[in-house]
UniProtKB/Swiss-Prot annotation:
Transmembrane segments: 9-29, 34-54
Stored SUPFAM superfamilies: ATPase domain of HSP90 chaperone/DNA topoisomerase II/histidine kinase
Localisation per UniProt entry: Cell membrane
CDD domains the record matches: HATPase_BceS-YxdK-YvcQ-like
Protein name listed in UniProt: Sensor histidine kinase YxdK
Keywords: ATP-binding, Cell membrane, Kinase, Membrane, Nucleotide-binding, Phosphoprotein, Transferase, Transmembrane, Transmembrane helix, Two-component regulatory system
Catalytic reactions on record: ATP + protein L-histidine = ADP + protein N-phospho-L-histidine
Organism: Bacillus subtilis (strain 168)
Membrane topology reported for the UniProt record: Multi-pass membrane protein
Record-listed E.C. numbers: 2.7.13.3
Keyword Transmembrane helix assigned: yes
Enzyme class: transferase
Gene Ontology cellular-component annotations: plasma membrane
């Protein structure tokens, strides 16, 4: 009702001004028969009230809809007036255009992800051949080639998951997963990486904790944290701990290294996209996308991730999982 009155405020104001004009006209014209004046003003007031009541009856659906603050795209019946009908048709046309643009955007996104997947797999094939050719070679030049190939493989994996993230809802499956088995799979996948940097993981798992997650996406997220821990520990420490423990109703995975640590001014921004910080400038191996993807993935999986660090002493990244659905 307030919105209706505000929308007709000008009309009501004009009626008041008209009443004042009639009153002063009667007064200055020497017509002091107030009974006639009040009769005229009463008729005008009755006409105005009737008009407003009619407009309210016809357009009340519009004002209820505008005042309700309802979310969603469903447009209710707005009323039978010409204004309501035209507004309803316009809204429906806008919704149809939005749906059309949404479908077009989804189609383009699907095409981009499909192209990216095909491109990554095409690049992986010659990399696999290179690995087969040089896997038995121990000369320094071949060791350097192996290192660079692994860097390309990690970059391709990051690119692949980054492109799939926009279609995450189509590409995940929540199920009970053994956290210890998942960690063993991560260690197996990165064993050459550990050897290359001479940093060796140690699992501290008391029981076989079952968590509800998507194994593929979580494995990638843990892998991103592990690779960071290894790269920033190399040459300073050969220790990397994967600790699993319970904290009330949650299971916690802690990836703890004893490397260079993260400066205090960078710790609040490590999950920002493309933020490399001081360590990224020092080591020149950071893209600033890995931890951002970790944060995005854990949020979508309804997990939490936090990070703490002491410069020169190491970094601890904790994943927290609900133990029950």
């Amino acid at each position: 009702m307030k919105l209706f009155l505000r929308s007709h405020a000008v009309l009501i104001l004009l009626f008041l001004l008209q009443g004042l004009f009639v009153f002063f006209y009667y007064w200055f014209a020497g017509l002091h028969s107030f009974s006639h004046l009040f009769y005229i003003l009463g008729v005008q007031l009755l006409i105005l009230a009737g008009y407003l009541a009619y407009r309210w009856y016809k357009d009340r659906g519009v004002y209820h809809w505008l005042s309700s603050g309802q979310e969603g795209t469903d447009i209710p019946y707005l009323g039978s007036s010409v204004f309501c009908s035209e507004l309803y048709e316009k809204q429906m046309e806008l919704i149809r255009l939005q749906h059309q643009k949404l479908h077009e955007t989804e189609a383009k996104l699907d095409a981009r992800v499909t192209y990216m997947n095909q491109w990554v797999h095409q690049v992986k094939t010659p990399l696999s051949v290179i690995n087969l050719i040089i896997q038995e070679e121990d000369e320094p030049v071949f060791e350097q080639i192996k290192k660079e190939v692994r860097q390309i493989e990690f970059g391709l994996e990051t690119l692949l998951y980054s492109s799939r993230l926009d279609l995450f809802e189509r590409d995940f499956k929540i199920e009970a997963v053994s956290l210890s088995e998942l960690l063993q799979s991560v260690i197996q996948s990165y064993k050459r990486f550990f050897i290359q940097y001479r940093v060796y993981p140690k699992m501290n798992v008391c029981d076989d904790h079952q968590i509800y997650t998507d194994a593929k996406w979580l494995k990638f997220a843990i892998g991103q944290v592990v690779t960071n821990a290894v790269k920033y520990s190399a040459g300073k420490s050969d220790r990397l701990e994967l600790n699993v423990f319970c904290d009330e109703d949650r299971t916690v995975l802690e990836v703890k290294d004893y490397g260079v640590g993260i400066p205090s001014q960078d710790i609040k921004r490590v999950f920002d996209p493309y933020y490399t910080g001081e360590n990224g400038r020092r080591f020149q191996e950071s893209t600033g996308i890995g931890l951002h993807l970790v944060k995005e993935i854990t949020d979508k999986l309804n997990h939490t991730v936090d990070i703490s660090s002491s410069p020169g002493e190491g970094t601890s990244v904790r994943f927290s999982f609900l133990t029950k659905m």
